[in-house]
Amino acid sequence: MSHSRLLEQLRRSIQIAQFCEQENISTSEGLERREEATHSRRRFLSMAGAAGFALSPMAAFASRKVPGPRIAIIGGGLAGLSCADRLQFKGYSSTIYEASTRLGGRCFSNRTLVPGMACENGGEFIDTSHKMMIAYANEFGLAKESVIKQAGDERFYFAGQHWTEAQVIDELRVVVSNMQGDVRSISGSASFYSKNQSDINLDNTDLATYLDINCAGHPLIRSVLDEAYVSEYGAETSQQSSLNFLSYMRFNKQSKFEPFGTSDERYHLTHGNDGVIEGLEAKLLGPINKGAKLTRLSRNIAGEYLLYFNGSTIPEKADVVIISIPFTVLRGVQVDPLVGFSADKTRAIQTIGYGTNAKTMIAFNSRYWATEFNSNGGALSDLPNVQNIWETNRANATSKAIMTDYGSGNRGAALRTNLLQSQVNAFLNDLNVVFPGIKANATKLGSNYIAHLEHWPSNPLALGSYTSYKPGQFTGIEGLNSEASGLVKFAGEHTDSFYSYQGFMEGACLSGLRAANQVLADIKSGTI
């Protein structure tokens, strides 16, 4: 799964290009076969849906409360809350400490930009394979809207002109054939603990260099892939490992390409994804302390963990600690040597890469892209102020509509909330090239455009959008992020594996579940 609908489409285009080359068929036939596969899968999903989705990961019948250790959870985002939910289900109470005045972290819905609509300041998309997020949505009765089935096409605007998906695939067919040797040579699961020589070599090759070599003579695809991966991981391709790209060139165990991937559906919660946060907050019975920023973590000779908040010299005490804040933020916490982080764990915390994605949501008077251009609002371009865009909350778009501008890499980092109006104006000028006439359709209040910028790179409680491995970090730190340090456990999207759902809301939920299970195992074994 990708962080935007259009990149997911591009990845499927890459898959089709490989499939067409492998089967020696035309691009048009490959596209027809994709349509057939899509319809078959959707029929299956509709039948499966009639039987109902899975129950909550922690169903309503929780165990009775039992005496247990003092459990402190640092961070009240999806990871921390799902961890507390699992522990509560097993009968153990925990105390959550959240630095912000609200819960949710990067799961943060915006219901004020356009009345009656919900856009997402943070995590937006939920795939059919995201079982915990779907189960939570069902448990709390939260409606879902499909964001794949929306009518209309995505747009590719590069080198001063529009390109069709078929044209992009035709170019991709030549390029991906150059990469097959590398795809076959990598293990497919490179990590600190398991890697081959190709993993090491390609991990230490930045993606920009890799694309320069393998896309030589194909400037369209070089630009498309560059913009797509800057958007997907939030960092310039010169700051990304080439394994970010190669790991998605999917092969099964027989090295036969799976041309149509594993999912063609994704959702957004119609009235805002942080409905899951609200549901969990209402469900949890243990203390939740907001406005509590961890500033120091220590340990005494009795083995108790000492947690200092907001610069206080008087600690809270715990027997076990789950840290679910981003490593970018943890770097600013004084962690005393007595806590016992290993050198490898410390290196992972201090060096892991994060993207600089920032989201600007802009209100429009209508779905101009749909009515005038038969587009679903998705576009990828090499224009200075339009990278990756999509329509948000289509289900609630009546007299108004919302478009999300996904600023990434250097552009995302450079955006500023105090320059919102000039930035939106520059965006609309470029968007007017992709969808001529659209600038006049943007909604204004007086002389100002109605828009909101959520700038995660400068948010002191995030300091980045989500995990983005730098060159060398698959073989250098993948697998270390989730490792416990004694009775200090770690959760958060960054601690879920790259090969699972790192960078997604589902990854945060899964990491919370894992951390809780680590605590439960320690209780069972008598370690705590």
Question: Where would I find each of the regions flagged by the language model?
Answer:
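Glycine-rich FAD pyrophosphate-binding loop
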Residues: 88-110
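N-terminal export signals
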Residues: 36-64
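Active-site/ligand-binding neighborhood in enzyme catalytic cores
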Residues: 23-28, 38, 193-296, 300-303, ...
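Dinucleotide-binding Rossmann-like beta1-alpha1 core, especially the glycine-rich loop
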Residues: 114-185
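N-terminal Rossmann-like FAD-binding beta1-loop-alpha1 element of flavoenzymes
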Residues: 69-95
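Core beta-strand elements of the Rossmann-like FAD/NAD(P) dinucleotide-binding domain
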Residues: 312-320
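N-terminal secretory signal peptides
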Residues: 1-39
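C-terminal segments that line or cap access tunnels to active or ligand-binding sites in enzymes
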Residues: 4, 318, 327-463
